Swiss-Prot record:
This is 3',5'-cyclic-AMP phosphodiesterase 4A. GO terms for cellular component: cytoplasm; cytosol; membrane; perinuclear region of cytoplasm; Schaffer collateral - CA1 synapse. It comes from Rattus norvegicus. Zn(2+) 1 binds at residues 423, 459-460, 577. Interacts with LYN (via SH3 domain). Interacts with ARRB2. Mn(2+) binds at residue 460.
């Protein structure tokens, strides 16, 4: 593991709003706000108009959330707490009512006549408990102190957020819930000091006379209690004064969480170069920063690389058209015998065996894709719709359903390593399991379930394999069309709904107008929530809602309005989209290989255009293990622990798997030795880094050319100018096949092919020094697009940098080869090269 580096001016610092002029810094919350009496939360079930005809089994066909690799143990085991601990690999040590509202008719079945959502006979779908039952539970960074300068003698040590089972306490961290808890405390203290009993018919559960009589308290104790009550009321007023009329209460939590994450990332970025890059990746991806993005002006040399080919310019389409749509003709008889799982396959028995785990967490979607002939999305979508009886409930013709599924899957790019139909199928199946959570049984209507499943299926359709920021920085037509706001998410929605207009593809043709409008609104809200820059806002919204109910007396989460219901659904799809780290390790590692391959392909495009390479997109410097540990610690764990609070205890096994996977990647970091001295900034062969905010860890273009210049090799510019002649000779990275191919083999092959193509002496190649540390994980090489193979729907994007950067990539591979020549092929640190991405996103 890399030794901690001294803090520098290059550390991460987000521009978050500070106190207004003349306003003092907010005081820390009173100490007791971190521990509140535990209040169970119940999510009220909706009623069924046909409840007399539906048995309990029919209403809940998927009651338990099971893991695909779990063993049947009979009765549900006792509640266990997550073993997740605060990350210690980067810095420091571990730390731990109102009246009921009737649902509108277009939103699915209405409550039964005479049965109110508040009816006492409605059994709860959820009971939430925070804290531990058998062991201490350490939480995410959200439960750490919000202030580094909290030195008040009244403040307790907040380094540990362990809830005490003996005292039955909940931990409250969202500001609005803390304000409510504070007001309740003030009310209780007032009752005690004045001997005025609290009416039992009011909201507070502390009805009746105070538990302690004022006469039993000394004068000094009463005065101290009065002072503390006044201080608490002042704190509460100060919190309310900072609120702005146009901001929701959950924005208080969002602002707080962003501030805390900023502090954690700053610490992480100061520890090592790789930590700096991980910090920037998390900041750029998961924080919706409103500050302007400064794009440096390209040099004349770089500008030549950014000119799109003339053939691309001629293909420009009017802005009014939705790009990426293809005219497809699906042959075969859709009106005759319908396949059992919606797709034709000669391995139906094996497919049926895999689909026995359809309603379990951890289904091996890779095996499903293999047995379904690469049609994993169509197979999963059809099977789920059949199992939930949605085709009959909404009168969806089977042939229309099959036509839409096939058309939708064909609009996912098979040559994109991660965001392909395989990922869509995985998110769809995960959403299906989360909808079947026992805590949410009988909560959502059939139309809401249909909307959630449809949103999961289309949420990444026509994804080009690059990020929103890449599209914005390159002035793509999509970014212009959607004004730089959730560019890809808006495009996915447009394509998903546009495909419904294709011949015999409208699966919602028999819905009423109001049902279609309601479904469309829900789908739009859920897909837009998959924009990762909205992550902290979604997390703050959900946590505020959960904790607000914890500090209220009722503890009943009614979900009786659209805002609350869609909030849960949005977070559900978001959780499914970020569920890879919660799956069995063998599946998680495959997803990690794929996302890194996609990142590196984007990095190659950025390098070709002379752009700054995005964090984690440089295949020469990215740290896969550290990125995954940081991803879990700062993004995935806080989200899933909040979801686990909502559906407690149903997500306990998911949290356990998440921790196991995090430990595996963390142990891989420990096995990696520190980079050699000459690799550190300011070391041998490297100039000192500039004193400015800069996360980029790759060598500058000019420095690379100077240090890697080898006689007999053309320069990058010369290669580009002679591109037409060189393409036939350049190394074709798409020919590097086989998931078992090691980088050593790839490097040896590249050495031979490049020497043949450019006449470079082999001796001069091996004379180049090695800058890779022996323990650095070898990252997967990716398939690159040919010059005529552009990302559909993204006009003006040239091919990747394989042909242009072949000499430099060869040198990097040669250096990796000499550094790792003694590495065994069984070493877990070696990540196999994924090779070409075949049908359905599977490796060919």
């Amino acid at each position: 593991m890399e030794p901690p580096a001294a803090p520098s001016e290059r550390s991460l610092s987000l521009s978050l709003p500070g106190p207004r002029e003349g306003q003092a810094t907010l005081k820390p919350p009173p100490q007791h706000l971190w521990r509140q009496p535990r209040t169970p939360i119940r999510i009220q079930q909706r009623g069924y108009p046909d409840s007399a005809e539906r048995s309990e089994t029919e209403r809940s066909p998927h009651r338990p959330i099971e893991r695909a690799d779990a063993v049947d143990t009979g009765d549900r085991p006792g509640l266990r707490t997550t073993r997740m601990s605060w990350p210690s690999s980067f810095h420091g040590t571990g730390t731990g009512g109102g009246s009921s509202r009737r649902l509108e008719a277009e939103n699915g079945p209405t409550p039964s006549p005479g049965r109110s959502p508040l009816d006492s006979q409605a059994s709860p779908g959820l009971v939430l408990h925070a804290g531990a039952t058998t062991s201490q539970r350490r939480e995410s960074f959200l439960y750490r102190s919000d202030s580094d300068y909290d030195m008040s003698p009244k403040a307790v040590s907040r380094s540990s957020s362990v809830a005490s089972e003996a005292h039955a306490e909940d931990l409250i961290v969202t500001p609005f819930a803390q304000v409510l808890a504070s007001l309740r405390s003030v009310r209780s203290n007032f009752s005690l000091l004045t001997n005025v009993p609290i009416p039992s018919n009011k909201r507070s559960p502390l009805g009746g006379p105070p538990s302690v009589c004022k006469a039993t308290l000394s004068e000094e104790t009463c005065q101290q209690l009065a002072r503390e009550t006044l201080e608490e009321l002042d704190w509460c007023l100060e919190q309310l004064e900072t609120m702005q009329t146009y901001r929701s209460v959950s924005e208080m939590a969002s602002h707080k969480f962003k501030r805390m994450l900023n502090r954690e990332l700053t610490h992480l970025s100061e520890m090592s170069r790789s930590g700096n890059q991980v910090s920037e990746y998390i900041s750029n991806t998961f924080l919706d920063k409103q500050n302007e993005v400064e794009i440096p002006s390209p040099t004349p040399r770089q500008r030549a690389f950014q000119q799109p080919p003339p053939s691309v310019l001629r293909q420009s389409q009017p802005m009014s058209q939705i790009t990426g749509l293809k005219k497809l003709v699906h042959t075969g008889s859709l009106n005759t015998n319908v396949p059992r799982f919606g797709v034709k396959t000669d391995q139906e028995d094996l497919l049926a065996q895999e689909l026995e785990n359809l309603s379990k967490w951890g289904l091996n979607i890779f095996c499903v894709s293999e047995y379904a002939g690469g049609r994993s999305l169509s197979c999963i979508m059809y099977t789920i719709f059949q199992e939930r009886d949605l085709l009959k409930k909404f009168h969806i013709p089977v042939d229309t359903m099959m036509m839409y599924m096939l058309t939708l899957e064909d609009h996912y790019h098979a040559d994109v390593a991660y965001h392909n139909s395989l990922h869509a199928a995985d998110v769809l199946q995960s959403t299906h399991v989360l909808l079947a959570t026992p805590a949410l049984d009988a909560v959502f209507t059939d139309l809401e379930i249909l909307a959630a499943l449809f949103a999961a299926a289309i949420h990444d359709v026509d994804h080009p394999g690059v990020s929103n920021q890449f599209l914005i920085n390159t002035n793509s037509e999509l970014a212009l069309m959607y004004n730089d706001e959730s560019v890809l998410e808006n495009h996915h929605l447009a394509v998903g709904f546009k495909l419904l207009q294709e011949e015999n593809c409208d699966i919602f043709q028999n819905l009423s107008k109001r049902q279609r409008q309601s479904l469309r609104k829900m789908v739009i809200d859920m897909v837009l929530a998959t924009d990762m820059s909205k992550h902290m806002t979604l997390l703050a919204d959900l946590k505020t809602m959960v904790e607000t109910k914890k500090v209220t007396s009722s503890g009943v989460l009614l979900l009786d309005n659209y805002s609350d219901r869609i909030q849960v659904l949005r977070n559900m799809v978001h959780c499914a989209d970020l569920s890879n780290p919660t799956k069995p390790l063998e599946l998680y590692r495959q997803w990690t290989d794929r996302i890194m391959a996609e990142f590196f392909q984007q990095g190659d495009r950025e390098r070709e255009r002379g752009m700054e390479i995005s964090p984690m997109c440089d295949k020469h410097t990215a740290s896969v293990e550290k990125s995954q540990v940081g991803f879990i610690d700062y993004i995935v764990h806080p989200l899933w622990e909040t979801w686990a609070d909502l559906v407690h205890p149903d997500a306990q096994d998911i949290l356990d798997t998440l921790e196991d996977n995090r430990d595996w990647y963390h142990s891989a970091i420990r096995q990696s030795p520190s980079p050699p001295l000459e690799e550190e900034p300011g070391g041998l062969g490297h100039p000192s880094l500039p004193d400015k905010f800069q996360f980029e860890l790759t060598l500058e273009e000019e420095e690379e050319e100077d240090s890697l210049e080898v006689p007999g090799l053309p320069t990058t510019e010369e290669t580009f100018l002679a591109a037409e002649d060189a393409r036939a000779q350049a190394v074709d990275w798409s020919k590097v096949k086989g998931p078992s191919t090691t980088v050593v083999e790839v490097a040896e092959r590249l050495k031979q092919e490049t020497a043949s193509a450019y006449g470079a002496p082999q001796e001069s190649m091996e004379a180049v020094g090695c800058s890779f540390s022996p323990g650095t994980p070898i990252l997967p090489d990716v398939r690159t697009l040919s010059s005529s193979e552009e990302a559909p729907g993204l006009l003006g994007l040239p091919s990747t940098a394989a042909e242009v950067e072949a000499p430099r990539d060869h040198l990097a591979a040669t250096r990796a080869c000499s550094a790792c020549s003694g590495t065994s092929g069984d070493n877990s640190a070696i990540i196999s090269a994924p090779g070409r991405w075949g049908s359905g996103g599977d490796p060919a």
